[in-house]
Regions:
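Long, contiguous amphipathic alpha-helices that act as assembly "spine/axial" helices in icosahedral shell
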Residues: 79-156, 179, 186-203, 319-327
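A structural detector for beta-sheet-dominated domains
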Residues: 45, 95, 156-158, 278-279, ...
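Sequence/fold signature of self-assembling virion shell proteins
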Residues: 215-345
Length: 345
């Protein structure tokens, strides 16, 4: 049975275990880069869009300066979790296993447990990265908080606004269409990217749709009896439709929650009143530092490059084994001026 826990086998199991679908992570953070070191390096672009100048015949070319690029080196903290495997686990029928139908050997059940535990551990890790994606997009920073660590990676995000008084959506002086057009133009001017995506939760959408000007901009093909026809997507995400006119954006709601391991409280991914105006064409990147571990008994330290690394740990008296999955992720908005966040309620 030990052969299923070799570093090579565990690496293959992790690779073949699918990621749980994630809305913000999958929609925006499409690029992935891994490092052979525990530290990662990334660039943040802020600056004007320059053009090539005219020059007189036979003149030398002027020197182009690299402006607006900030390079940062950072050592991501580890995210890791383990699942225990005891003698009783491989002898007792698993959930969903048919009773009294054939006999499942401990060896076969160990293989089933490996697949099940890997999926659940990876699901937890992917969900935690979805929380990081939300933090980066909605707050312009990654707050790394856990046992023995409380760190903030600030990406110098400045495209944000809080509406006040009667200018808030749903109030008498609200100008929802004008607000969105203004925020889109600000992103376009600063980054060159024209936002094509709006994300909010369902409560914020309800207020937005109370504006007749907004409702009139949605694609008529998605409207029946005056009501929008929604399309379910990843967990908690709904495609509302395409908003035309001067806005030209796909509209999504995202109602998803997570339990914060630091305080045990259930929290929203996208808070009520938050609006994300973004382009899914801009560069948002998932970076992963390397993990250095002792992969098995009698082995030396080994450094692994990749998104995840899994190993088996063993304790004696009482005898128990643990399956541990770990990662060093940091999510980075390379084009930090390409999106805008507003508090609209």
């Amino acid at each position: 049975m030990d052969n299923i826990y070799t570093p090579q086998t565990l690496a293959a199991v992790v690779r073949r275990t699918p990621d749980v679908p994630s809305f913000l992570k999958d929609l925006f953070f499409k690029d992935t880069k891994t490092f052979l070191t525990e530290t990662v390096s990334f660039d943040i672009v802020k600056g004007r869009r320059t053009i090539t100048p005219w020059v007189a015949p036979n003149s030398t070319a002027p020197l182009s300066q690299r402006t607006g690029v900030t390079t940062t080196t950072y050592k991501p903290a580890q995210k890791k979790e383990k699942r225990s495997i005891t003698e009783n686990d491989i002898k007792v029928r698993l959930a969903g296993e048919q009773p009294f139908v054939g006999t499942v050997s401990p060896e076969e059940r160990a293989i089933q447990l490996l697949a099940q535990d890997t999926q659940e551990l990876k699901d937890n890790l992917v969900r935690s990265q979805e929380v990081m994606a939300a933090d980066v997009l909605l707050n312009g920073q990654a707050h790394i908080k856990g046992e023995g660590i409380d760190d903030v990676v600030d990406f110098n995000f400045t495209n944000k606004e809080t509406l006040a008084g009667n200018a808030r959506w749903g109030q008498s002086a609200a100008e929802i269409v004008a607000n969105i057009i203004k925020w889109k133009k600000k992103c376009l001017k600063a980054s060159g990217f024209n936002p094509n995506t709006l994300v909010m939760n369902s409560e914020t959408l309800e207020v937005m749709l109370s504006d007749k000007k907004i409702l009139a901009l949605f694609d008529n093909r998605r409207t029946e009896m005056g009501l929008l026809q929604f399309e379910q997507m990843a967990e908690g995400a709904v495609y509302v439709g395409f908003m035309g006119g001067q806005i030209q954006c796909n509209v999504f709601t995202y109602d998803n929650y997570y339990v914060d391991p630091t305080d045990g409280q259930e929290k929203e991914m996208v808070a009520t009143g938050k609006l994300l105006v973004a382009s899914d064409m801009a560069k948002f990147t998932k970076l992963y530092g390397a993990n250095t571990i002792i992969p098995g008994e009698g082995m030396d330290f080994v450094t692994y490059e990749g998104e995840y690394v899994m190993r088996r740990l063993v304790t004696r008296d009482p005898d128990a084994a643990f399956l541990e999955l770990q990662s060093r992720p940091i999510y980075v908005p390379f084009d930090v001026d390409s999106y805008f966040v507003a508090d609209v309620l």
